[in-house]
């Protein structure tokens, strides 16, 4: 009979588990905050109609960080091509 299973006698290695658990927790919270910020940006954008806003929110919600990146890339490209400044007149007083 073994005194303890193989691997459980290693004293310092649980620290790595706690480190990675904390790291993934912080990454998860950061991704969640980015998704919420993206959804707020979608809701504030005047250039999108209601159906487009709903579709973008669904894309961001179900695809997560990938959906947020896609939205960011496509919205920046569209705002440059249309000359949209998100409702702001730059240079006018």
Swiss-Prot record:
<keyword id="KW-0472">Membrane</keyword>
<keyword id="KW-1133">Transmembrane helix</keyword>
<feature type="transmembrane region" description="Helical">
    <location>
        <begin position="17"/>
        <end position="37"/>
    </location>
</feature>
<dbReference type="Pfam" id="PF13396">
    <property type="entry name" value="PLDc_N"/>
</dbReference>
<dbReference type="InterPro" id="IPR027379">
    <property type="entry name" value="CLS_N"/>
</dbReference>
<keyword id="KW-0812">Transmembrane</keyword>
<feature type="transmembrane region" description="Helical">
    <location>
        <begin position="54"/>
        <end position="74"/>
    </location>
</feature>
<dbReference type="GO" id="GO:0005886">
    <property type="term" value="C:plasma membrane"/>
</dbReference>
<keyword id="KW-1003">Cell membrane</keyword>
<protein>
    <recommendedName>
        <fullName>Uncharacterized protein MJ0574</fullName>
    </recommendedName>
</protein>
